[in-house]
Amino acid sequence: MCRGQSVDLGTREKFTAFEKHLKEFNPNLHFSDFSERGLNSFVAFLRDKLKMRNTTIAKQLGFLKWFLRWATAKGHNTTTDFQYFAPKLKTTGKKVIFLEWEELMRVFEYNVPENGTKVKLRAADGRCYEKVVSDAAALRKTRDIFCFCCFTSLRYSDAANLKCANIDGDAMTITTIKTADTLRIELNKYAKRILERYKAHWTNDGFVFPHLTNQRMNFYLKELCELCEINTPVTETYYRGVERVDETHPKFELMSTHAGRRTFICNALMMGISAEIVMKWTGHSDYKSMKPYIDVTNTAKAEAMRMFDER
């Protein structure tokens, strides 16, 4: 789907993936297959065949129930077991992946080498290795668009659809794609520096940044953060069925476009900016959605205070 269309591309991609999972489960599905027994079989397929986490399974069931409610309302479906189907799926809180300020500055200031350059890197365990730069132009675009999100709180979808007309001097006014909220966001010096890099090349269709799909952005963002040695080990805990799984990865492997907005929120709160003001920039309407970020910053504050004990 092209930019500028009203349907959220991210939502479209999620439902496309959901449709694929249904076809993999049973290419000849009928509504009658979604009895309680069939629903349990679908959950087992997602867990055992596709190796999904419980949190992901819950999202897939949410998509399925939405579709079955629609089909029931339209008279296509008469099997209503889904209305009462609520499997116990043990979950943990999702870890907030974001860049600390020093890490963000490392990415922001990174001078991407030319294609084919062999970059010497050091892993968190001290191991040295080389990585070849694959697409310098895409990495530079990724750096700038991602950092713009980190400095403005924009979701990637809103940064990708940002138009020159949205920029008004020291601020920008946008209507968000996901929630249709109209927000006025002041531009700090870092965001302005990024805009200056693109002013001479603003496209004829009015978009501020050159287009990269979310999928490509995520791919190049991991490579960019690896080149910047954003490799602190991060452990994630999740459940697959009743099995608890603990996985540790270097942070760059966990980076995605979602981390841009999270980076803005966490750093703003750690700078001492009140949650009320941050919410005016992000468009959050209640503290519940801000709580994971506040919890992260409270932990960071406690760790920072312990530095006094080490003096």
Give names to the regions the model predicted:
Residues L9-E13, F25-A44:
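A Lys/Arg-rich helix-loop hairpin that forms a DNA/phosphate-binding surface
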Residues N54, A58, N77-Y156, Q215:
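Basic, Lys/Arg- and aromatic-enriched nucleic-acid-binding interface segment
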Residues C128-A136, W202-T203, F207, K222-K280:
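Short, basic (Lys/Arg/His-rich) helix/loop patches that form interaction surfaces
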Residues T152, N161-R197:
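Conserved tyrosine-mediated DNA breakage-rejoining catalytic core shared by Y-recombinases
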Residues T176-A180, N214-M217, T282-M307:
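Catalytic-site neighborhood detector that most strongly recognizes the C-terminal catalytic loop/helix
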